[in-house]
């Protein structure tokens, strides 16, 4: 498959393929936090992220969620449908943690009666600001129906993920999703799902996600390896 680099991000490089509707996503060993302020090369991270994300996306596809995932090509590569990314980070919170706890001055780990969906404007220059539905419409990112769909689909994905992670003894605290328009203009789930973009706690409250890197709590790949081993119990 001939390929040309079209985008280099913090965690992945994106390449063209011979099919204009398909891309190759190559996962890097780079770990970043605080919008790239903290950065480190961690051997083996790319392989683990690709394994975990490929596994989750395959399960989501089977469950009827429309995603960009086609297949895992190698240890670090996967084949994806090409999408026009919607410049929103869609965050769902099942428990208080991270920026939510800081913003509202509350402890981490409080269960939310109803999961909260938040939007963040994907713009590195502006540090990905927290925005509401009216901002989304003002910026002409999405209209009312699209906003409603993004929230509904995120909540549906959450119900699936919560069950899967509970089965392997992990609590899904929160996560970030990205969506895009496919070649037919349909909104589908894109990007990845790994401990890079979610918070997972074990029964003892230990962090099993990128907070290990953010907060200097241990070796990132050790934690990701445990998550990957647990996920394979779902097969």
UniProtKB/Swiss-Prot annotation:
Biological or metabolic pathway of the protein: Purine metabolism; IMP biosynthesis via de novo pathway; 5-amino-1-(5-phospho-D-ribosyl)imidazole-4-carboxamide from 5-amino-1-(5-phospho-D-ribosyl)imidazole-4-carboxylate: step 1/2
EC numbers on record: 6.3.2.6
Keyword NAD (UniProt): no
Domain of life: Bacteria
A family per Pfam: SAICAR_synt
Reactions this protein catalyses: 5-amino-1-(5-phospho-D-ribosyl)imidazole-4-carboxylate + L-aspartate + ATP = (2S)-2-[5-amino-1-(5-phospho-beta-D-ribosyl)imidazole-4-carboxamido]succinate + ADP + phosphate + 2 H(+)
CDD domains reported for this sequence: SAICAR_synt_PurC (cd01415)
InterPro entries: SAICAR_synt/ADE2_N, SAICAR_synt_PurC, SAICAR_synth, SAICAR_synthetase, SAICAR_synthetase_CS
Enzyme class, spelled out: ligase
GO biological process, one term: cobalamin biosynthetic process
GO molecular function, one term: ATP binding
Keyword Nucleotide-binding: yes
Keywords assigned by UniProt, alphabetized: ATP-binding, Ligase, Nucleotide-binding, Purine biosynthesis
Stated family: Belongs to the SAICAR synthetase family.
The protein's name in its UniProt record: Phosphoribosylaminoimidazole-succinocarboxamide synthase
Organism: Streptococcus pneumoniae serotype 4 (strain ATCC BAA-334 / TIGR4)
